[in-house]
């Protein structure tokens, strides 16, 4: 099991969101349910990319502690990394940061872990292939991240014998 600092080194930007008036709760901060929705949808997309399948469902979200408020006009960035693979599941470490466009500094707003399970057409859990797990780990080892840009994918493909 990796430490939080080791996980942070492998974080990949998944999405950016600007907080609008429709995201705000009654006390002037981003509504917690909106943040949870952003986390669930974005990490589901990340899990699907990592596992090469759109058929990933959320089965567990660990504790979420909201550390800093998000106001209208704030930009938040969601980062993710694979914490571990199971037979049919992938657990992600998620960190959402508020980004200051003037200074470039970021502060953590919330972090959590979220688990997704791969399912078949009937909704039954099915294994995540060993190839997917191995490829992800090789990419992290080589590139420091598991998902690659289009250019990196072409380079990776061309470098194979």
Report residues per predicted region.
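HotDog/MaoC-like acyl-thioester-processing domains
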Residues: 2-4, 9-13, 71-72, 83-161
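Hydrophobic beta-strand-centered segment that forms part of the acyl-chain substrate-binding groove
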Residues: 8-10, 30, 44-79, 83-85, ...
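Active-site-flanking beta-strand signature of metal-NTP-handling nucleotidyl enzymes
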Residues: 14-18
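Short, ordered coil/turn segments that flank beta-strands lining enzyme active or ligand-binding pockets
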Residues: 22, 26, 121-122
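A conserved, well-ordered hydrophobic junction motif at loop->secondary-structure transitions
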Residues: 24-38
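Short, residue-level hotspots on alpha-helical faces of the histone-fold
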Residues: 37-41, 45
């Amino acid at each position: 099991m990796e430490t939080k600092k080791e996980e942070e080194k492998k974080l990949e930007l998944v999405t950016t969101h600007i907080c609008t008036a429709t995201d705000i709760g009654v006390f002037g901060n981003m509504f917690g349910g909106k943040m949870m929705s952003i986390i669930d949808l974005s990490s589901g997309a990340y899990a699907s990319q990592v596992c090469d399948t759109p058929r990933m469902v959320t089965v567990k979200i660990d504790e979420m502690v909201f550390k800093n408020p998000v106001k209208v006009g704030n930009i938040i960035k969601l980062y993710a990394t694979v914490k571990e693979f199971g037979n049919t599941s992938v657990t992600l470490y998620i960190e959402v940061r508020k980004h200051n466009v003037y200074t470039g500094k970021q502060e953590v707003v919330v972090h959590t872990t979220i688990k997704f399970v791969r399912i078949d057409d009937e909704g039954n859990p099915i294994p995540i292939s060993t190839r997917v797990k191995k490829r992800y780990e090789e990419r992290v080892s080589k590139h420091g991240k598991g998902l690659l840009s289009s250019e990196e994918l072409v380079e990776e493909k061309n470098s194979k014998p």
